[in-house]
Regions:
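C-terminal segments that line or cap access tunnels to active or ligand-binding sites in enzymes
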Residues: 85-195
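A glycine-rich dinucleotide-binding beta-alpha-beta segment and adjacent secondary-structure elements
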Residues: 120-122, 179-238
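Short glycine/threonine-rich loop-to-helix capping motif typified by GTGT followed
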Residues: 23-26, 57, 155-159, 190-205
Length: 248
């Protein structure tokens, strides 16, 4: 933030209620306080469903960016962030702990619409160097993620379900030989419901449409939309999240 302000950036803390246009071209945005900000270029960093459903005005609605239905959503997630001591073995910066059988996880999510009973766990150990050693200190920052159904707009996860889910996560890690000190005090940082609240229209989906099959990642909208001056970024547009597609 300090660097942005130093470079002359104006930061507005209001919500954007509408993207404005004239003759099919971007002219600005309308904020929730009624103010208009004039511009001929906008970078939208969010779920592209929000554009068609909420932000694009009627004048350019015929130039749809893209859309997807409730039945055609990608994965959501449950995540934890913590700063704890670990033991058992040295983590890498990126770590994946697979469940067994792996296919059951996606059956739980896409066919049954529920949190996997035995989820695969991803851990980003942010303070680890490439050789696995800690940058400094004994505690380290950890980001844990498991896949979940994108049903945040119509389903709620109970406290009992969350306790069961968290227990299965740390049970898998322990089974794999990783001990995390005092995991009971770890708060849940994000759920499908919270992702949905942050990105209305997504239902909590993180990647837009589902990417089933090797060609499906290429069906995402590109960064340049059909609307002159409107550009897209984020996990729902090409190349999507992570390194594999960005590398290609």
């Amino acid at each position: 933030k300090k660097l942005a302000i130093k470079k002359g950036v104006n930061i507005y803390k209001n919500l954007c209620e509408e993207i404005l246009s004239y003759n099919g071209e971007i002219t600005g945005v309308r904020l929730d306080n009624g103010n208009h900000i004039l511009t001929d270029k906008i970078i939208f960093n969010g779920d592209f469903n929000d554009l068609d459903n909420y932000l694009i005005n009627q004048r350019i609605r015929n130039k749809r960016v893209a859309n997807y239905s409730r039945k055609n959503r990608s994965l959501s997630a449950i995540t934890w962030m913590m700063k704890n001591k670990t033991a058992g073995f040295e983590l890498c910066r990126h770590n994946i702990f697979f469940n067994s059988p792996y296919r059951k996880e996606f059956s739980d999510i896409f066919k049954k619409g529920r949190i996997p009973s035995d989820p695969t766990v991803y851990i980003c150990a942010q303070d680890r160097l490439n050789n696995g050693s800690l940058v400094s200190g004994k505690e380290e920052r950890l980001f844990l993620l498991i896949n979940a159904p994108a049903n945040g707009d119509f389903a709620r996860i109970s406290k009992t379900e969350m306790k069961t889910c968290q227990a299965s996560v740390f049970s898998l890690l322990k089974k794999c030989g990783l001990e995390i000190d005092n995991p009971q005090k770890v708060p849940v940082s994000m759920t499908p419901q919270k992702f949905y609240q942050r990105f209305p229209g997504s239902g909590g989906a993180l990647y837009g449409r589902p990417t089933h099959g090797w060609l499906s990642p290429f069906t995402r909208p590109s960064s340049r939309s059909k609307i002159s001056g409107l550009y897209l970024s984020g996990g729902t547009v090409h190349p999507g999240p992570g390194l594999p597609m960005a590398t290609i």
